[in-house]
Amino acid sequence: MRSRSPEALQAHAGTRTDRAQSLGPFRVGLPALDRFPQKAWSRLVSRHARQLPAELMAYGGPRGHLPLRAAVAAYLRAARDVRCEPSQVLIVGGSQMALQLCAAVLLRANDVACVENPGYPGAWKALAATGGTIRGVPLDGAGLVVRALERRRRARLVYVTPSHQYPLGMAMAASRRLELLEWARRNDAWIVEDDYDSEYRFASRPLGALQGMDGAGRVIYIGTFSKVLFPALRLGYLVVPQPLLARFVDARDALDLFSPTLYQSALTDFIAQGHFARHVRRMRSTYQNRRDALVGAIHRALGHRLEIVNADAGMHLSTWFQPGIDDLAVVRRAADRGLYPIALSTCFVDSDARSGLVLGFGGSTKAQIDRAVDALSRIIDDVVGGRPARASR
């Protein structure tokens, strides 16, 4: 059994750095920037910049802008069944900062943090930064296998993406959620719930947040505006159980003081005026159409190479390669052609990795997706070496 943690972190981090300024096809986590309501957003930002009062030009508090915290709490109660008050909401610089705060508050050196396997390497990096030991827990069709988690008796916390698992895309079953909550209660452990891509389900109504099922106060809930609106906004949020709140506020204050108040105040009005809810509704249809375009293109051009894992939600889908295809080699050559998938093998920890690709579709039109899949097909043929490259269709 190979230990994948250092290699996977390095490979994933390198890929993210290389793609930092790219808008190329297959970019995971990139929303439909072409559909963002720029006029409404720009109008609000301009108005707040012109009328910015002195108190919003000074240092802000580590909890975040109170009107935004109230708007976030109201949205989460209505849309995600989260049990929270504005006092429990902390505004942070995206989900990665939220994970850093969870590690700083909840983990000590050598504590065990469990993660989904495969899962999100960015979470491993944040949780390992305090000296925590990362251990993978396998998945099945219902999500995290809690029976396997039971064997991690020293686990201090578990990080999960129950609404839309990254990278495989399944939702954690309700019965499995109850098992996980009982495990946390019984072991005095914490659950970090990253509500990744929860806004976009295509085949069914989403389950409410795991946090809303928690009667023991063991769940820390993470969300972000970066993927719903645009990544450069760098605003996200935590919902923290009351007994932990003071420690999280202190950690936030030590890490970065506060997030820009201009954007916080503009976002508050963006939500209050209904732009946010309308944008989410429009994007469900947009992403379903783009998902359909990618699935169709894969079936036409790559059905003999790729098996689609799950395509029921979100802004990406994952695929398994047929045996013998090196996903890292494919990703390197794809980057040279301006395509930016993620090698699925880099998402595995503490086990033999399986080869595949994570393909983002949120930021690309149907025409761009069709061209990108044709180019990817030729790249894979070149890597395999068994067939000549095919001309674009």
Predicted feature residues:
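Short beta-strand segments
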Residues: 27-28, 138, 159-161, 192-195, ...
